[in-house]
Amino acid sequence: MQIIEIREPEQADFKPEQQIAVGIDFGTTNSLIAIAANRKVKVIKSIDDKELIPTTIDFTSNNFTIGNNKGLRSIKRLFGKTLKEILNTPALFSLVKDYLDVNSSELKLNFANKQLRVPEIAAEIFIYLKNQAEEQLKTNLTKAVITVPAHFNDAARGEVMLAAKIAGFEVLRLIAEPTAAAYAYGLNKNQKGCYLVYDLGGGTFDVSILNIQEGIFQVIATNGDNMLGGNDIDVVITQYLCNKFDLPNSIDTLQLAKKAKETLTYKDSFNNDNVSINKQTLEQLILPLVERTINIAQECLEQAGNPNIDGVILVGGATRTPLIKDELYKAFKIDILSDIDPDKAVVWGAALQAENLIAPHTNSLLIDVAPLSLGMELYGGIVEKIIMHNTPIPISVVKEFTTYVDNQTGIQFHILQGEREMAADCRSLARFELKGLPPMKAGYIRAEVTFSIDADGILSVSAYEKISNTSHAIEVKPNHGIDKTEIDIMLENAYKNAKIDYTTRLLQEAVIEAEAFIFSIERAIAEFTTLLSESEISIINSLLDNIKEAVHARDWILINNSIKEFKSKIKKSMDTKFNVIINDLLKGKNINQIK
């Protein structure tokens, strides 16, 4: 596979007077910042000569200290989380238990002698990265492309953008980490195909199926686990060392486990004082974790329709473990691509995209996907899906909706997220009302509704009614998002309940149709009694009773058959004039239009 040349350029490649933007990989364990010029990437080192800066923050002597592996860790896991989610998730609670303000109504941490929100704390890490880059490049930096996990929701994305804004960055684009890595690999004009991006970082695992055609990058499916990463491998090794050699479960033992893991990537054994572990033992210990990632990758392929893939792109420092490459090859029998340093692939892609956005010289395009379907609640609690699960974004979809009852002067819009067929089983994102509509017969008012997801994954919904020239728009706020765990649960529940959901929807649709049918017929009888004989009215009422009984029985097949029976018998036995009235009513026409 041919890849773009990526090298450490001379300092002269970066001129302060040029408009520049940086790429930032804000990682769970480590963060990086880089800049690209003429499609050559430079990862910017910290003042102590490190490219990988630990994503830790401490506050001592009235100063923030970044990257010293002390204080608050893995703050990235807190993006988009509510206080309730933190309290109910042991893994998250353990991260912040020493800082958490449990008396607050929202998530705040006691930090720097203040009560701070997560974006305010994370902003200090962005400030540190910004200062390091400005010192190296001798220029002010204000623009950035920032990477986020593929499964970050609106809430998390919004807080990342807020943190960067507090730090003084204009965020040009948020892009998914696997997408950024693929961008670093796939810029060659002749590159095309379908690739699986396997991203195992310190704290999260993401997998994407990426289609590359004629310079267009399209993520066609995503999956992952935001509570699985290289840190879990370290924990497994630490537990083994504690049990095998009677060591304390301490930071020192954890560091020893990390050293053993790193050594065993290129040696068959590791020996340190009275501790020893060989490659075979290591692989036995971590195989269950690796198999979990393989299963997630296979599920992602199924979501994408099982396309033929041309290679696997490795991202994340944890992928240096030889067992991962071996197991991936066993599972997929294709090339494993690891030409680029897996720790840097994401930030390289971000830097290249940043350069592309401020000085476009390529037609390459990145496309992410919506992790869950988005839609609206219809009458009767039915969900109308408007943007489907795994639809490429950015996207905008327009649909038309109408009133259900006469003289309706407002339409309630309930925005939902999820794969189930009924609103009660989906996640509520937002509600708004289009008011001031002219009172007219049901079905006359037409509201044009637009669902749009921008390149950063933020959803906005607008509605417009032409007759009254009334409009309303809403942007779904970050606190309406959901996390990766909930996404997995919702997808699993949708799969398990697919059959019952389908029949529930069919029943509800049949009931709604029957109720509208009964209303229209009874209204016609009341207004056109003179056209009917007593025997005809008796036949109509008898047939209507059959429909009502079917509705009461909650049998959608019986309901549909009862309506068909009504139409058939009325057509044969009723006066032609009344038949015209009935047909027009059932087509949604106004009685006053019937001549």
Curated annotation (Swiss-Prot):
Record GO terms (molecular function): ATP binding; ATP hydrolysis activity; ATP-dependent protein folding chaperone; unfolded protein binding
NCBIfam families: PRK01433.1
BP terms from Gene Ontology: iron-sulfur cluster assembly
PROSITE patterns the UniProt entry points to: HSP70_2 (PS00329)
Role of this protein: Chaperone involved in the maturation of iron-sulfur cluster-containing proteins. Has a low intrinsic ATPase activity which is markedly stimulated by HscB.
PANTHER family xrefs: HEAT SHOCK PROTEIN 70KDA (PTHR19375)
Domain of life: Bacteria
Protein name from the UniProt record: Chaperone protein HscA homolog
Transmembrane segments: none
Keywords: ATP-binding, Chaperone, Nucleotide-binding
Family as reported in the entry's similarity comment: Belongs to the heat shock protein 70 family.
Pfam families given in the database record: HSP70
